[in-house]
């Protein structure tokens, strides 16, 4: 959402 690992994965 804001640039987290889960967001990019």
UniProtKB/Swiss-Prot annotation:
This is Alveolarin. It comes from the Eukaryota. Keywords: Antimicrobial, Fungicide. Antifungal activity. Inhibits mycelial growth of F.cinera, F.oxysporum, M.arachidicola and P.piricola. Lacks protease, ribonuclease, deoxyribonuclease and hemagglutinating activity. GO terms for biological process: defense response to fungus; defense response to Gram-positive bacterium; killing of cells of another organism. Homodimer. It comes from Polyporus alveolaris (Hexagonal-pored polypore).
């Amino acid at each position: 959402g804001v640039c987290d690992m889960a967001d990019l994965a």
